[in-house]
């Protein structure tokens, strides 16, 4: 419950104060599997941002089913997340929810890039910023008919409709996608 309040105050503050950054990282907290609850998939990217003086924010999606703890340097995304879930119950798609939350309190959050794990909220982030580059970081095995990446010989609509690029672990996974995708989206 405390994370909801921390999140609420952080995002309400954005109503009054602009925050411009280069990269937003977003992921469900169940990926915090490392020492001190670090996200080991994103840790090298955080370190690279620090090394190259690239500004970034880390938002963690709540996961009530997970026993993983939050990382101390992340910002709980609880408040917007639960509003998005509520709006879904009323039939709003994530892009529409983004427009509503943009109007209410996210208009001062400016970013150029978004890196997510598990394709989390990519439609929402596309709705927040049509111009941003959105990346999904591979966190598991990709095979030729993995529906979250390939469906009926083409890139999944969640990826292609939101113009998402992939950050992959090696050329082998890129080749799998290239060979499986008849539309050449992944080329």
Predicted regions and their residues:
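The feature marks helicase ATPase cores and/or their adjacent C-terminal helical subdomains
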Residues: 183-187
């Amino acid at each position: 419950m405390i994370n909801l309040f921390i999140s609420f105050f952080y995002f309400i503050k954005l109503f009054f104060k602009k925050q411009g950054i280069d990269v937003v990282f977003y992921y469900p907290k169940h990926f915090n599997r490392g020492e001190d609850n670090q996200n080991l998939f994103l840790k090298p990217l955080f370190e690279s941002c620090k090394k190259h003086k690239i500004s970034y924010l880390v938002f963690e999606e709540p996961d009530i089913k997970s026993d993983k703890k939050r990382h101390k340097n992340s910002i709980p995304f609880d408040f917007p997340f639960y509003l998005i879930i509520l709006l879904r119950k009323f039939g709003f798609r994530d892009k529409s929810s983004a427009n509503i939350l943009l109007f209410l309190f996210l208009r001062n959050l400016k970013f150029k890039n978004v890196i997510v794990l598990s394709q989390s909220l990519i439609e929402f982030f596309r709705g927040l910023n049509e111009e941003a580059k959105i990346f999904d970081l591979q966190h598991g095995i990709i095979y030729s008919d993995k529906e979250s990446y390939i469906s009926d010989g083409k890139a999944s609509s969640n990826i292609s409709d939101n113009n998402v690029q992939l950050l992959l672990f090696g050329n082998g996974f890129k080749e799998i996608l290239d060979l499986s995708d008849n539309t050449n989206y992944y080329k």
